[in-house]
């Protein structure tokens, strides 16, 4: 009990009798506070270590018996041979494949629509996103449009306080295609995040989409795809890793599980970004540590 100004208890402030001591002793009832269940979610499979990509992709044929793969990337990566090792591995396993390489920075809904038109004609059972955040974001949106043509982006982008308690129920993913994400820069962490941003070029509206249904099924973090990053990209993406890790650590939704990943990622950035910037491919260890830091910060984020 506590002595308070006013009278009455249980939230009341008026009585039909003379105010006495019993009315000043206001016994409050407080509801029991229960915290939400928390969870830590990542892609089902996360492969890492230099040279891991061919081994990881081997599962598509030997374990999953996939038949058709649709590769999403940008023109630079396609023209500079980054797609070739993937195509060679798919050919080796007898998996048919085609490639959409028209993704631009800040991908648009119109670009995604063009890609998904090709996707529907090809009817793949696997989608492979190769690139930075833009390519992976575009591929995630294409995945949604391929599996659920009726999807409404205005509904999917609806604000929410808790990703588990949103008004809009995100459609179930993975019934048509298995999603593989392969980063070529150590920065966005999109290969392990449930986020995608798409812009409507006609209206200028950006749709930020967030739902655990957008988590890739497999992430392949092979530093062989990141060795030749230019200095500008190395520095910018390295700071991106740092901001993801710090934001994850100070978030009100931070947990013991995310804190460990976030702090380790920060430590790895401080220890390896300068050398990755100065020495590039001449310091493969620093490159690999930055690739891992990016993925870990993405998990924490």
Tell me what each language-model feature is.
Residues 7, 25-35, 60, 64, ...:
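Structural signal for hydrophobic packing residues in well-ordered secondary-structure cores
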Residues 193-301:
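Carboxylate- and glycine-rich phosphate/diphosphate-binding segment that chelates Mg2+/Mn2+
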Residues 2-4, 8, 22, 45, ...:
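Structural motif
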Residues 14-22, 46-50, 54, 63, ...:
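Electropositive phosphate-/nucleotide-binding environments in soluble metabolic enzymes
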Residues 37-126:
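ATP/NTP phosphate-donor binding region
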Residues 110-224:
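Glycine/threonine-rich beta-strand-loop-alpha-helix active-site module
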Residues 1-37:
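C-terminal segments
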């Amino acid at each position: 009990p506590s002595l308070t100004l006013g009278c009455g208890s249980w939230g009341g402030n008026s009585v039909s009798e003379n105010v006495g001591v019993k009315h000043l002793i206001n016994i409050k009832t407080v509801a029991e506070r229960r915290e939400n269940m928390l969870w830590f979610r990542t892609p089902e499979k996360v492969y890492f270590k230099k040279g891991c990509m061919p081994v990881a992709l081997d599962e598509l044929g030997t374990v999953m018996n996939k038949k058709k793969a649709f590769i999403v990337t940008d023109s630079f990566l396609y023209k500079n041979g980054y797609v070739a090792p993937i195509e060679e591995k798919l050919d080796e396993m007898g998996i048919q494949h085609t490639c959409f390489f028209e993704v631009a920075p800040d991908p648009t809904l119109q670009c995604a629509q063009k890609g998904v038109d090709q996707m529907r004609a090809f009817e793949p059972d696997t989608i492979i996103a190769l690139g930075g955040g833009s390519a992976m974001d575009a591929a995630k949106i294409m995945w949604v449009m391929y599996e659920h043509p009726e999807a409404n982006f205005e509904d999917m982008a609806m604000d929410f306080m808790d990703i588990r308690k949103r008004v809009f129920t995100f459609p179930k993913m993975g019934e048509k295609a298995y999603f593989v994400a392969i980063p070529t820069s150590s920065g966005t962490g999109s290969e392990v995040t449930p986020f995608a941003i798409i812009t409507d070029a006609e209206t200028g509206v950006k749709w930020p989409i967030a739902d655990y249904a957008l988590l890739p099924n497999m992430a392949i973090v092979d530093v062989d795809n990141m060795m030749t990053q230019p200095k500008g990209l190395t520095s910018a993406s390295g700071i991106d890793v740092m901001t993801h890790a710090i934001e994850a650590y100070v978030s009100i939704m931070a947990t013991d599980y995310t804190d460990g990943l976030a702090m380790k990622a920060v430590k790895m950035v401080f220890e390896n970004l300068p050398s990755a910037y100065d020495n590039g491919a001449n310091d493969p260890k620093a490159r690999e540590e930055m690739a891992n830091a990016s993925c870990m910060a993405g998990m924490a984020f």
